[in-house]
Amino acid sequence: MVDWTDPERSAIVGLWGKISVDEIGPQALARLLIVSPWTQRHFSTFGNLSTPAAIMGNPAVAKHGKTVMHGLDRAVQNLDDIKNTYTALSVMHSEKLHVDPDNFRLLADCITVCVAAKLGPAVFSADTQEAFQKFLAVVVSALGRQYH
């Protein structure tokens, strides 16, 4: 269990209320697939991922990006129990999908970049970034929990 300070909790929940999950999710997943092309192997059913433009315009990428962000919403709603909230997802990603757990960190970095670019430094201050990155690190840890 993570001990969140009141300012961290406030920063995470406040920032989350400003994030458009339907905008940031597709951007972040597309960025991951472009910047870390080896991650594309997990998305072979998504169709054309051959160029950055194809990835950015791919409806399956957009849909899954939204799914990822809605999954993060579950973590925001369960800040005190993120590990248990993500148990089933961790099992699925490790045992069924065989996703390298480091890919979760890479996606978290892409989410951070997209949020910062969208909201700017007035909203995404250093203190807010610190709390958000701590939150994402806890999510990444929870997703990697079932790996051996």
From Swiss-Prot:
GO terms for biological process: hydrogen peroxide catabolic process. Residues 3-148 form the Globin domain. One of its GO terms (molecular function) is haptoglobin binding. Heme b binds at residues 64, 93. Red blood cells. Keywords: Heme, Iron, Metal-binding, Oxygen transport, Transport. It comes from the Eukaryota. The keyword NAD does not apply. InterPro entries: Globin, Globin-like_sf, Globin/Proto, Hemoglobin_b, Hemoglobin_oxygen_transport. It holds the Pfam family Globin. One of its GO terms (cellular component) is blood microparticle. Involved in oxygen transport from gills to the various peripheral tissues. Belongs to the globin family. Heterotetramer of two alpha chains and two beta chains. This is Hemoglobin subunit beta-4.
